[in-house]
Amino acid sequence: MRNEYPRPDFIREKWMPLNGTWNFQDGTDKTPVKIQVPFPPQSRLSGFQKELTSDRITYQRNFFIPAEWIGQRILLHFGAVDYKCSVFINDHCVGFHEGGQSSFTFDITDFLSGGEETLTVAVTDYLHDETVPRGKQFWKSSGEFIWYTQSSGIWQSVWLEPVNEAHLEWIHFTPDIDQGTVEITYSLSDCTVFPCELEWDIRFKDHPVSHGSLTVSEKRGKIIVDIFKNKALRGSFHFTGWYWSPEHPNLFTVSALLKSRNILLDQVETYFGMRKVHVHGGRVYLNNQPYYQKLLLDQGYWKDGLVTAPSEENYIQDIQKAKEMGFNGCRKHEKAEDPLFLYWADKLGFLVWESTASFWSFSPQSAAVFSQEWTRTIQRDYNHPCIILWNMMNESWGVPRLYDNTQQQHFARSLYHLAHGLDPSRLVIANDGWEMTENDICAFHSYKHGSLDNPDTQAAFSLGLQSLSGLENLVERPLFADRFVYEGQPVMLTEAGGISLKTGKDKKSWGYSDTDSEESFLAAYSHVIRSIYASDLLCGFCYTQLSDIQQEQNGLLDEDHQFKTDPKKIKAINDSRETTTSFSTIEDY
């Protein structure tokens, strides 16, 4: 059962998990069966593990509100439900949500009976509709190629939480390492009676950093807190021990208290990292230093849970294994990952390019829903220092005419500006892979690395990585959309490899190229990575991929997320690039 605290970046002491056994109905089935939430009904861990017969499914369970919660407002939280749902308490509709990747909350207080309560979630997931965001979920009955089994309904945690009428809705932290400050923005509930006091206590490794309070007279506001205490020379060489990075994932813990006349109304435990990311001269900088990204494509699938990890420990192990192989981050692919993963990426030190599920057929309605999902995702995940980039779209999915269609180009550009408007502290890629409009990184995909028995193709791959003109020969479509050109952005190969190590167990499995032994796999892997390292044009890469997924058997881990080869050998290849390499300036190209 998934009963870990589901929102570790915004913790309240009192809460109640609603994960576990629920009643479940597929379509018009009259007799409910048992299902384990939050695992999708198509997964083994759900206990149902069947292909759905209908777009409509229903969940139901009973619960009691603890006696000590009486008199408070009761919030019902959903981590994510795919695709849209209506929520009922005791047959009264308390709210509706559309969007399979985003979290949502309803205040259910006024619908409670005071006894045994009945919670019903009526879900609609359009199994074959290509206009709704679906990511890698195939619209046919079974997975093929790079498409996987569908994951419908509740797929992240459900829980209850008591709060006073006056409480904190959210807190955002925006660090500024150049000034040594953090900007704290906040929002209070609509029922808050003003004036009241907002108090904060910031600590670093249990050492006090800042303690203060502010009289609040409006629902929303901001505070600037001096973290480095106005000390001289706040630059890179004096406060790096306080910065967040994959090598040193330093976090500041925060207690935020809302009070009225010295009466505690709300208390939240949270955290932030002092971290800066920007681009300059064709390079990506982390904390004002050039930083070479060695990323893994991570699609967040598990054999038994599909898009839902079997446990919190699975997130920890994935990050630890990736770091053990010499990677410093991941590009999340077609999925807004569970906040628990982001928490452990913060704690363990692991860069994240955040994503969400794409739709496939363009329409203004699809574009509106997709934009709304991104708005919610950025709002929810804003505080995670591990996230350095919002990766809005992939390979023109959902915008198939992006190259020359003005409307679709406007949409791609609108996503870029939406993300920067909501969050100026991170990088943004509107479209990853090719047909770029406005991107902070020139991010291209190529699997034309060749095979060990085709040295000419291997040589062409290595040569193509040396120049912008050479990249055009390595991608499936033009690098830039019509009327858009390269403007000096950092250049990264953000999908490459996908090499399969075939063991003969499953002839239907595939990769972008095949090997038949650990020795041949390591030779092929080394060719890809060393070709990347030989290019002064590139400032990072993303290798496909972390783990095998169903028929796509091209991961560095198998479908059980265990090593397929010696991780020390992978790390030796990844570490073969000299960290002291001096970058050429982009003007050289």
What is the predicted role of each segment?
Residues 1-332, 344, 373, 386-389, ...:
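Secreted/periplasmic carbohydrate-active enzymes, especially glycoside hydrolases
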Residues 329-561, 569-574, 582-588:
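Substrate-binding/catalytic cleft of secreted carbohydrate-active enzymes
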